[in-house]
Regions:
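Active-site catalytic motif of lipid deacylating hydrolases and related acyltransferases
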Residues: 19-79, 129
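N-terminal export signals
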Residues: 1-16
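Conserved serine/cysteine hydrolase catalytic core
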Residues: 66, 172-214, 218-232, 237
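Flexible "cap/lid" loop of the alpha/beta hydrolase fold
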Residues: 101-146, 173-180, 210
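Glycine-rich His-Gly loop
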Residues: 29-31, 86-87, 110, 196
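Gly/Ala-rich beta-loop-alpha elbow adjacent to hydrolase catalytic centers
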Residues: 84-85, 89, 93
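Conserved alpha/beta-hydrolase catalytic His-Asp/Glu region
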Residues: 140-185
Length: 246
């Protein structure tokens, strides 16, 4: 059964957030165990609100390649843009977010490292989330097992739908996990963070730590790691807020 919808603001908007420029463009980046279609429910709501939404097909090979794919999408935007990342792609948002077109950053249950920070070492300061034990490797390519995907990644998604999502997950290359950001866009740009309180992929307390450290305007959503699918109205609303359309 899907979790009840809860979106609780836990931090007041920072001065930076209040000064964010209005935008009509949104670039969305997916993380591990997913593909660009994971944003479909959010995109439909953004388009209905008059936003121009672009979902990046993240290659999941190296951090540099993922940032380059996102940069290509940013290059196509015609003005101020909100850059949104889920899960691993918070790394990409942190790096690519320095682009001058990007006026605000949104992290959805996402990694948010500082420049040159070892994210793995940071994550080890918190209890390990169950999903990591479910990664299955074929040579240097990893993906979640079906059991781990249904239980630890998409726990509040109806099983039939979660199985479809499992089938379209893109494998990721081992080298991707060793990449480090060289910039931290959140240090200079307004940031928002959606914590997933029922997350079994990234520890919710780690999410809270990263959100607080960056001074992000933060909400807590009672959702699995896939709040963008189980609670798309909340995530779309957060994006519209960051874009100045709330």
């Amino acid at each position: 059964m899907a979790a009840a919808t809860v979106a609780t603001p836990i931090l007041q908007p920072t001065a930076q957030a209040q000064l964010a420029r209005k935008a009509r463009n949104v670039v969305l980046v997916h993380g591990l165990f997913a593909d660009g279609s994971s944003w479909s429910e959010v995109i439909a709501r953004l388009q209905a609100a008059g936003m121009n939404a672009t979902s990046v097909q993240n290659p999941l090979t190296t951090l540099d390649a993922s940032v380059a794919a996102t940069q290509r999408a940013l290059d196509l935007q015609d003005g101020p843009t909100v850059l949104v990342g889920h899960s691993f792609s918070g790394m990409i948002v942190t790096q690519a977010g320095i682009d001058p077109k990007v006026v605000s950053l949104i992290y959805v249950a996402a990694r948010a490292p500082d420049a040159n920070e070892d994210y793995t070492a940071l994550a080890k300061r918190f209890p390990t989330s169950p999903a990591s034990a479910g990664i299955v490797w074929t040579a240097d390519w990893g993906q979640l097992s079906e059991a781990a995907f249904l239980r630890d990644f998409a726990g509040d998604i109806p099983v039939a739908k979660a199985r479809v999502l499992y089938s379209v997950q893109s494998p990721f290359q081992r080298e991707l996990l060793s990449g480090k950001t060289t910039h931290a866009a959140w240090r200079t740009k307004p940031s928002w963070y959606a914590v997933s309180t029922e997350d079994r992929t990234i520890n919710p307390d780690l999410e809270r730590f990263m959100a607080k450290r960056m001074g992000a305007t933060t909400i807590e959503v009672k959702a699995s790691h896939l709040s963008l699918i189980s609670q798309p109205a909340i995530i779309a609303g957060l994006i519209l807020n960051a874009a100045g359309h709330a």
